[in-house]
Amino acid sequence: MISTLASLVKSFFGKVPKEDATPPAGDAAFAQAIALHQQGALDRAETLYAKALATEPCHFGALSMLGVLCYQTNRAQRAVELLARAVAIDPVQPGTHSNLALALNAVGRGRDAVESCDRAIAIDPACVEAYSNRGNSLWGLGRRDEALESYARALAFDPDHAQTHWNEGFLRLQLGQFDAGWPKQEWRWHLPHLAASRRPFTQPLWLGKEDVAGRTLLVHAEQGLGDTIQFCRYAKLVAALGARVVLEVQPPLKGLLANLEGVNQLVARGEPLPPFDLHTPLMSLPLALGTKLDAIPSESAYVRCDPDAILRWREKLGPSTLPRIGLVWQGTADNKSVPLAQMLGLVSPVAQFFSFQQGVSVADQALLDSHPEIRQDAAGLHNFADAPLLALMDLVISVDTSVAHLAGAMGKATWVPLPYNPDWRWLLEREDCPWYPGMRLFRQPAPEDWGCVITQVRKEITARFG
């Protein structure tokens, strides 16, 4: 449910402005800010937007586009404040209402976001961005059928609106409609922030139609580390078709995936590539191989750590009469994260607890240090060097992070607390996870309600180990 800069700028101007276009206010600082914004120089653009506002506090364009910039840089509440001021100055600009909806949705005000989109549509009944953003907001509220209707309206006005196709694809996947969802994921290459990272290979793209037997297929990772851990399982399936598989992964994963079955050669991104005949982005393999909900390749343990490394950790930890439980509470998005103070509610004498949290905030570190019963052996370990320690856990409790994927891929018993509207891969309602047989999902019954989730998980810990 992401909007690109081009879409955001387009919804403000009515079209993506050229660098030599004169902005509505004709202000020099604003004009420079827009050019820098589109070039990705966000710090410099922000400085110039602020300069324009210092000169003219009610500068509609600067308020609007600084709001967009704040949204892009994960300052959604500030974006709401700026865009709301812009709307108050000029309430008849549909793009500004639509952008405000994005920011409102990001701070959990989904109903207000829908209303903002409705105002944009009332001004311009053909506002594609507003229909698309309305779909995102409705999806976040759990009104998925209405979201699909809004996406359909957006695509009726613009059949090539890549952002809408991509978002609808995620929703279809969350609904388990894989036949419709996987093809729409290919629209990602029409999004500016992803198109720029598309690999310019001269070898043909393979999406499952050509025979790969006897040919070398380069499978190259994309997007996040968790995505790579989840989808690297497909290497084995491609190898079963007779292909020689070269897998390119992010550098932190090279050591971890060194023994992945089905891979003839593993390389880290940035290393020289061997000769190959065809290539496939890793996230396109489910489409290429026709993955269906009832036939997800779900081998229980396809990522295996070095046995010697596990032995070294076992000796370091020493014997324990208690089960070991690993904890991760902070994800990349606030709505995926459980506050540490609440996560500590799981700690009890029935088990020995270990923190596997990376990038601990100063406040969380102080709180963590006040609980010596939680071991911090994994602190300071990077590039998945803590995987052998993770292998010694009897249970891993992790929010939606790469650690959850790693534990699942290692076949560990893994419990995942999920937000009310989770990422597509966790589907809906079910407690099990078809991607990872050893995983159990604990879902929020209502937005932001981690209390019920923690209470349930604590009861299950007691039932399992108490």
Regions found by a protein language model. Name each.
Residues M1-L395, D400-G466:
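Alpha-helical solenoid repeat scaffolds of the TPR/TPR-like class and their adjacent stem/linker regions
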